[in-house]
Design a protein with these regions (language model features):
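A glycine-rich dinucleotide-binding beta-alpha-beta segment and adjacent secondary-structure elements
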Residues: 303-353
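Short, well-ordered beta-strand elements within core beta-sheets of diverse protein domains
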Residues: 9-12, 238-245, 282-292, 308-311, ...
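Conserved Rossmann-fold dehydrogenase catalytic segment
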Residues: 122, 154-163, 185-199, 220-225, ...
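Short Gly/Pro-enriched turn/cap motifs at secondary-structure boundaries
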Residues: 220-225, 230-231, 333-336, 356-359, ...
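Aromatic-enriched alpha-helical interface/lid elements that frame and gate functional surfaces
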Residues: 90, 215, 228-304, 308
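Substrate-binding/catalytic subdomain of NAD(P)-dependent oxidoreductase enzymes
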Residues: 180-220, 297, 314
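N-terminal helix-loop segment corresponding to the beta1-alpha1 unit
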Residues: 1-186, 362-479
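Glycine-rich beta-alpha junction loops
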Residues: 119-121, 197-203, 237, 245-248, ...
Length: 479
């Protein structure tokens, strides 16, 4: 939806509280506000008057990406921000502002949504610990699992360069904030969101929690992966990533390779056998892949329904035909070529309307009138809070048909369910979700399709409807 008319206050400056602000939380706050600004919200970025900024100080001019579609005003700690808070719909901060304690916000601005993005949350024994991207990665166990299938126990775990964990978890924070803001605009009831980057990152560790809670096994980056083949291989002109979690995908890959003699060996006939002989599979598969062209193989694999994709370099990404055809790259008003959204909308709500502002470029300004904002803005002010007997979750009344499976889709729809939506998972009785079939059952529990931990961790809070979509009667039910 368009967010035109929504007012977002981004507190980039560090407050006067005793918290331990970090670069990670500063970038997370900036990313949340950017996501709102890119969809039309009126975003005011409150920055430190002395120029001490955790985004502006980052290399490679990161701020020119994270501060687009925002206005910048300078702030001194002895100056109140009540006027801006009073007319804001959402304030995003790093937990260092005492005036944004939950009880104070509720009393002074009952319709305001306040999102505190901190490394460990605002309660608990770790709440005042200093932390950065490295801490979030390794504290959540994400780093401990990387790189997967490592062979040398003496080598340390790794993290990807940059701020991948921060951007990922901050996107989840923005989704929660968007739902809360929508709820507040309808009911007048604000919300305090205590968002823990640490907890959100732990949610993304996929099978590790299921292995611990369902199997009593500590997941590790060492040893053989559960699925073989699964990894990055060299081709004649670049790299590809390949994974074959299902037997039929392996059989399609064998056919794609021309049914080589080695593929008929009992040692590679089944998934357990391939896992037992992973080195052998890697040698044979690597020899064949070394003769293939990345682009040609990727197309052939798509037709064969085999999961093979190019491993793209930065230069290749910039020149990628698919991304350019979809208009992924966008040009800001200052001429910089920037990354666009990962989605396409029917309506032109996403836009790079303004370049990154200079520090204090908009000093003295306040909120734009809601009616003057482009798009479908809100008319009038925030509604008065309505008293109800029981607090409602923001997406109650929303119904979602979930046709996804495996991981990414179920994770997204589960998030909607946690926020109150009624999510109905449409499933095939003939071919259940792969995660239902994974062997993640607690000791002593029969191998049942409803008992796999890999399915449970991403599908709680949902309803399930088994439908044969190939049958006209099944399609009629769905329609």
């Amino acid at each position: 939806m368009s967010l035109a008319g929504i007012r977002v206050l981004e507190l980039a400056a560090v407050g006067s509280g005793e918290g331990r602000p970090s670069t990670a939380s500063g970038i997370a706050v900036a990313w949340v506000a950017k996501l709102f600004g890119d969809l039309g919200a009126d975003v005011i970025r409150v920055e430190s008057a002395d120029g001490d900024d955790r985004v502006r100080s980052r290399p490679h001019e990161l701020h020119r990406w994270l501060t687009t579609n925002k206005r910048s005003i300078r702030h001194r700690l002895d100056e109140p921000i009540d006027a801006l808070l009073g007319d804001a719909d959402l304030v995003v901060h790093d937990g260092s502002w005492p005036e944004l304690a939950p009880e104070l916000v509720t009393a002074a601005w009952p319709g305001l949504v306040a999102l505190a993005v901190t490394p460990f949350g605002q309660t608990g024994p770790y709440h005042d610990y200093a932390a950065e991207e490295l801490s979030v990665i390794h504290g959540s166990s994400w780093g401990f699992l990387s790189p997967s299938a490592a062979t040398d126990i003496a080598l340390p775990p790794l993290k990807a360069a940059g701020h991948h964990a921060t951007i990922n978890v901050a996107t989840a924070a923005a989704a929660a904030a968007a739902a809360a803001v929508d709820h507040a605009t309808r009911t007048g009831q604000g919300e305090h969101i205590d968002f823990s980057m640490y907890a959100a990152a732990a949610k993304l560790t996929e099978f590790a929690p299921a292995a611990a809670s369902f199997l009593g096994v500590d997941a590790s980056r060492l040893g053989t992966k559960t699925v073989v083949p699964w990894g990055i291989f060299e081709c004649a002109d670049g790299l590809v990533s390949i994974i074959c979690p299902e037997q039929e995908q392996w059989e399609s890959l064998v056919e794609l390779m021309g049914n080589p003699e080695w593929a008929s060996l009992d040692a590679v006939a089944t998934q357990p056998a391939r896992r037992e002989n992973a080195d052998l599979v890697g040698i044979y598969l690597g020899e064949w892949l070394a003769t293939q062209s990345v682009d040609e193989l990727a197309v052939q694999a798509q037709h064969a329904r085999v999961c093979i994709t190019p491993v793209t370099t930065m230069a290749q990404l910039d020149a990628n035909d698919h991304l350019n055809a979809r208009g992924f790259f966008a040009t800001a008003p200052d001429g910089t070529r920037q990354l666009g959204p990962g989605y396409k909308l029917d309506q032109p709500w996403w836009a790079l309307g303004s370049a990154a502002p200079a520090l204090g470029e908009h000093d003295g300004e306040t909120w734009h009138p809601r009616a003057d904002l482009p798009g479908h803005g809100l008319d009038g002010e925030r509604p008065s809070a309505r008293k109800t007997g029981q607090a409602s979750r923001p997406l109650e009344g929303v119904r979602v048909c979930d046709f996804t499976w495996i991981w990414a889709g179920p994770f997204a729809t589960q998030y909607l369910a946690h926020l109150g939506a009624e999510v109905i998972k449409i499933e095939s009785p003939e071919r259940p979700c792969l995660f239902r079939r994974f062997p993640f059952h607690p000791p002593g529990l029969e191998d049942h399709i409803d008992g796999s931990g890999s399915f449970q961790i991403y599908n709680t809070d949902k309803l399930s409807l088994g439908v044969n979509v190939r049958d006209p009667r099944g399609r009629e039910i769905i329609e």
